[in-house]
């Protein structure tokens, strides 16, 4: 009995009792009051709105500066164009070699080759016309070759009263050829198909011209293309009659080996100095 008690005591003494786990006190949670939370959110929102407002003001300022720069550029261009026009006017009329009529404008367009330029502008789209405010620009590709200022120099465009068309004429298909000129006779628009003017139709103008533009004065028919349908029709008819006569003449002279008038026709340069294609 004593032995059993002794063994029990030894076993009890050698048993390892697990140490009790003492829970650590948790850190207190810092809860932000609802009113303070709203203040933080409002602060972030205010900063975002402030940034957006600064960006908006910067954009407005940028647009304002850009608009002012563009306006100043147009004003300088207008002044330059007026100066160029006045300089050309002071030179007076000039005659081209061979006695051809030249009526200069700001862009120095030769009226005798105007139809060829129109043909390019309308059909080949080599030239394009852009209207911005009171300025008209003529481009060849992306290159600005003329700046026309639509100001009143005291010259008035030639206007003729429209004749009342008969019912028969009204039903006939009308040619869709139109040219638009400003008050100093410069081409500012075109639509339709135009023939190239034959340079033989361009002869010296009779009598001195007061200005280099002859929107108000007479010149010969070959150099009098001012955009009126009557003059254009006459020029087309003259060319068609001449082509018919030349065709009959060439048909009778084929045996002699002579070419047609079209083969001998010299191609004229355009206003920017390049030949017609």
From Swiss-Prot:
The keyword Mitochondrion does not apply. Residues 255-265 have a biased composition (Acidic residues). Residues 1-18 form the signal peptide. Residues 237-251 have a biased composition (Basic and acidic residues). It comes from the Eukaryota. It holds the Pfam family PTP2. Keywords: Glycoprotein, Repeat, Signal, Sporulation. The keyword Lipid biosynthesis does not apply. Transmembrane segments: none annotated. It is found in: Spore polar tube. InterPro entries: PTP2. Residues 237-277 are annotated as: Disordered. Involved in formation of a polar tube through which the infectious agent is passed on to the host cell. Interacts with PTP1 and PTP3. This is Polar tube protein 2. The lineage of its organism: Eukaryota, Fungi, Fungi incertae sedis, Microsporidia, Unikaryonidae. The gene is PTP2.
